[in-house]
Amino acid sequence: SAEALETLHLVKTVIMDKTGTITEGKPVVTDILSDGISEDELLKIAASVEKPSEHPLAGAIIEAAEEKNIDLKEIKEFTAVSGRGIIAESDGKTIYAGNKKMMDENGISSNGFEDKEKKLSEEGKTVLYFAEKDKILGIIAVQDVPKQTSKAAIRQFKKLGIDVVMLT
């Protein structure tokens, strides 16, 4: 509207949604770190558990498994835990998939993965933990790639003295 354009010069801060605004909106798996099993086995378990989920991170994991032609396991039970992750049953075993808080709340030691999670998070990646019963199997990092134009646009805002805040 004309009124919005007239007041635009007063803007001090721009708040942007990350997914689809700054990024492509298509997360991809960037790192797979396993403990006691192969990376492909971890990806098989992870994709199997994530298959019923509609979360964009689940889609990235499933796509990574499909690219490697990994056959998925059958999932018997599937429970989404809001803000935490998923609890599922496969081959008679309880599988946990989610953030560190979910692992902590279920008494699952992250077995030295905290430093790796911190490093990956600092790179702008989202880290998901996977555990079977009470044993951590590994972590998978997922990242949404920034759009080609995002850096230049943010630089332009900063040149104009406008702060940029990203919501995630």
Residue positions per predicted region:
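Cytosolic catalytic headpiece
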Residues: 2-168
